[in-house]
Structure formats: structure tokens, C-alpha cells
């Protein structure tokens, strides 16, 4: 492991070994729904609350990663650590999920960038021989997030066109020193305040943080955007993606022909009632696991930059008219030759 520049790390022996994805009914009806390992038929998944549904989704993603690992191992594999994050207060879904597992646990929170944060931490630990198998995971549920950050689900208030619809999705993967896709570098983001106060327009506050991390990554690694086949962002959706491209172009970085935003793609914006697209920690966890990693394995892409985008929204601070800061973390995945 080598530190590169101010914020980046180059890895020598970190891989994604197994993965699993699960999504909700509306997400399954979207353009990438068929790529998910499993989908729900309703918002409860047999439980009596939305929170319990989200716990069940994240648990199932973890369980199936372990099942897949058992299928390729001669003996029952040991999970050395789990690193999870979600959008609920005190990352409640992650904490309650972990009650089932007698495994060391780190809970993380970078809002919708939590999944990439967990992968970065897991990669650092694997590189430093903390263990052989570390599970990273994240989730979101439309109804838990609406209640958490905006209004009660029964409120029924009107929303602006630039509003984003929280995806119901969960993903987990296993970071190891062997695997199918290599994780070659990462860039840890900084908290950026763009003086944005509208909790309905989170992509606007996330786009500058995303741009900052991309610029820092290219500078730290002395790289060009031409070195990457695809630039994947978490949940900027339609409007935030436009802002990101404009900011980067001002810095001489053109991603117009290679940008893929998970929030913009997880739904069909033109035919589904999702306003300007999707958001939530499950966006990047679901789409990365269900679609992007498989495209690398199949040889469609050689090198991909993936950026988790997190708006650090706090309802109390918003009620005090404080601006909403944001953070973005970045990893690079490469195909094995």
C-alpha cells in the first residue's frame, strides 16, 4: 500500500471476491432491475415495519455473500470483519443487522457515500493483512429515508421536479486478497460546503464534492480521465450529473461520453414516478453489485472510477437554516488480465 499525493492510496493486493444485490419492486421495474440477484414484491418483505424490511434486505445480501464464498471454498470461510452503513439514525439498520453475526463490526456513515467508504476501509485492512475476508455493505429504503429526512410517509405533500426518489436497495460484497476484480486505488474525499440549504435538492450540494474528489484523484495519481473507461457516480441523478459535468469541464476534464450515474439509471425517469431520478445509499450498492462489476468481469471495461456521493443532511441543522455539506469517496476497479 502506497500513499499517493494528498488523499489517495494505491493498493497492491485487494480484490472483490463475492457480491450480492437486492432491490425493491419499483427498482426491479427499472432498466437494470433484471440484473439484481433478488427483488421484493412490496415495501415490507413480510415484515411489520419498513425498518425491519431494510434490515432483512441487508441481512440477506450478507448471507448470500457468505453462501457464495462457501461454495468456492474447501472449508467454511472465516469472516474477519463487517463494515456496514445506512441512512437511519445511529445507522440503526446496520447495528440491528449485526445482532445476528458474532463478527467484529465497524459502522460507517457518509450518507449515500457510505458503501464506498466501507470498501475503502476494508481495502486498507486487507492490504495490511488484518484478515482474509471482510464484508462491506449498505442499504436504503424509500419509506425509512422519507420518514427520516423529509416528511411522514402519510403527509402527501407536493415535491418539486428536482426532487430525488430514495431507492429501496441493498448490496454487500467481500473484500479479500484474492478475487474476480482488482481494487487498485482509492481517494478519500473532503467535506465540501456549497452553501446549499434545500433538502429537496441534494444532488446540487453533492456535485461539487464529487468533482473535487475526481480532480484530487487525477492529481494525486498523475492520471488522465482518458485512462478510465467509465466514471460511475452514486446518486447525482439527472440534475446533479449535469452540474458535475459542467464543473469538471471547467477544469479541462470531459466525462460526457463516459459518465454513468446509478441514481439516474436505477429508474426509468421518463416513465416511473421518481422525479429527477434515484438517490440513497442503496443506489450505488445495488447497481455496482448487480451490473457494473459484472461488466468488468465480462471484459466490457478494463478500468472504472467509482465515486460515492453523500449529502451530509441533518434535519436539526436544516431547521436552523444551516447549509448542507457533502462528501464523496472514490475507488478504482480493474479487470484481471
What is each model feature region?
Residues 27-29, 93-95, 145-151, 242-244, ...:
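Short acidic, glycine/serine/threonine-rich loops at helix termini
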Residues 49-56, 79-125, 162-165, 171-172, ...:
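Active-site-proximal gating segment of KS-fold condensing enzymes and close homologs
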Residues 109-136, 175, 279-300:
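Active-site-proximal alpha-helical scaffold in enzymes
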Residues 1-48, 152-216, 220-223, 257-264, ...:
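Condensing-enzyme catalytic core mediating Claisen C-C bond formation in acyl metabolism
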Residues 9, 51-58, 62, 111-115, ...:
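Generic structural signal for well-ordered, non-membrane alpha-helical segments
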Residues 84-85, 134-140, 304-309:
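Short beta-strand segments
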Residues 87-91, 111-115, 140-144, 233-239, ...:
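Gly/Ser/Thr-rich loops at beta-strand to alpha-helix junctions
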Residues 1-83, 87-94, 100, 209-226, ...:
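Conserved active-site "lid/cap" helical segment
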Amino acid at each position: 500500500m502506497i500513499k499517493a499525493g494528498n488523499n489517495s492510496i494505491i493498493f497492491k493486493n485487494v480484490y472483490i471476491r463475492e457480491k450480492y444485490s437486492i432491490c425493491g419492486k419499483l427498482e426491479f421495474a427499472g432498466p437494470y432491475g433484471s440484473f439484481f440477484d433478488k427483488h421484493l414484491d412490496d415495501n415490507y418483505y413480510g415484515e411489520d415495519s419498513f425498518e425491519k424490511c431494510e434490515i432483512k434486505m441487508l441481512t440477506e445480501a450478507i448471507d448470500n455473500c457468505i453462501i457464495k464464498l462457501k461454495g468456492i471454498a474447501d472449508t467454511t470461510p472465516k469472516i474477519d470483519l463487517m463494515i456496514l452503513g445506512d441512512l437511519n439514525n445511529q445507522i440503526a439498520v446496520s447495528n440491528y443487522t449485526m445482532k445476528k453475526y458474532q463478527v467484529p463490526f465497524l459502522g460507517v456513515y457518509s450518507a449515500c457515500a457510505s458503501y464506498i467508504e466501507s470498501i475503502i476501509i476494508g481495502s486498507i485492512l486487507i492490504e495490511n493483512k488484518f484478515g482474509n475476508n471482510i464484508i462491506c455493505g449498505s442499504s436504503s429504503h424509500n419509506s425509512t429515508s422519507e420518514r427520516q429526512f423529509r416528511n411522514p410517509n402519510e403527509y402527501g405533500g407536493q415535491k418539486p421536479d428536482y426532487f430525488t426518489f430514495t431507492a429501496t436497495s441493498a448490496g454487500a460484497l467481500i473484500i479479500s486478497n484474492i478475487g474476480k476484480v482488482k481494487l487498485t486505488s482509492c481517494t478519500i474525499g473532503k467535506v465540501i460546503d456549497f452553501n446549499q440549504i434545500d433538502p429537496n435538492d441534494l444532488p446540487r450540494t453533492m456535485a461539487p464534492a464529487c468533482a473535487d474528489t475526481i480532480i484530487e484523484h487525477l492529481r494525486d495519481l498523475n492520471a488522465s480521465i482518458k485512462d478510465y473507461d467509465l466514471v460511475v457516480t452514486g446518486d447525482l441523478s439527472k440534475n446533479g450529473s449535469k452540474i458535475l459535468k459542467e464543473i469538471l469541464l471547467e477544469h479541462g476534464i470531459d466525462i460526457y461520453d463516459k459518465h454513468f450515474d446509478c441514481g439516474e439509471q436505477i429508474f426509468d425517469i421518463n416513465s416511473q414516478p421518481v422525479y429527477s431520478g434515484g438517490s440513497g445509499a442503496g443506489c450505488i450498492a445495488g447497481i455496482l453489485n448487480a451490473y457494473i462489476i459484472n461488466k468488468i468481469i465480462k471484459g466490457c471495461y478494463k478500468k472504472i472510477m467509482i465515486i460515492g456521493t453523500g449529502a451530509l443532511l441533518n434535519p436539526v441543522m436544516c431547521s436552523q437554516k444551516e447549509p448542507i455539506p457533502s462528501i464523496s469517496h472514490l475507488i478504482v476497479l480493474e479487470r484481471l488480465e
